[in-house]
Amino acid sequence: MSSKVYILGGYQTDFAQNWARNELDLFDVFKDTVHTGLNEVNLEPKDIEVAHVGNFTAELFCNQGHLGGFFVSSDPVFYSGIPASRHEAACASGSIATLAASAELELGRYNLAAVIGIEQMKNV
């Protein structure tokens, strides 16, 4: 490991919340998670250099597979473009996304990464 990597903070949505009943979809929760998570650690979207999303079943339950692109839609600051990728590893998707971000930070490619793990499993 060439440099130390730190997790600055985190945010977790309410598991009991019924998204459909509250007229929310995957993107609404994603956007809220980005902004609330950054606020929790006193960062702004402009501080993020790379983004990783862990997700297992968005294609099946939400008809959406390309979740890295959600960053661009979640804040105008991201319109300038940041590298963003989605990682799928069943129940370990969020962990794999974290490991991918960690590897980029260890290499010195980036100084600050955002990692989001998100699921909406409607029929399980």
Model regions and ranges:
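Generic detector of short, locally flexible boundary/turn motifs and exposed helical patches
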Residues: D14-N18, E49-A51, V77-G81
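Short hydrophobic/aromatic-rich motifs at helix boundaries and adjacent loops
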Residues: V5-L8, V41-P45, F70-S74
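Conserved beta-strand-centric core segments of catalytic alpha/beta enzyme folds
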Residues: M1-T36, E40, S93-V124
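Conserved catalytic cysteine-centered active-site region
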Residues: A58-L112, Q120-V124
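Noncatalytic linker/hinge segments flanking ATPase motor cores
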Residues: A16, P45-G54, A89-A100
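Signal peptide-proximal N-terminal region
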Residues: H35-D47, F78-G81
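General beta-strand structural signal in soluble alpha/beta enzymes
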Residues: I7, V53, R86-H87, V115
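Metallocofactor- and cofactor-centric catalytic cores in central/energy metabolism, strongly enriched
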Residues: S2, A20-K31, E44-H52, A58-F61, ...
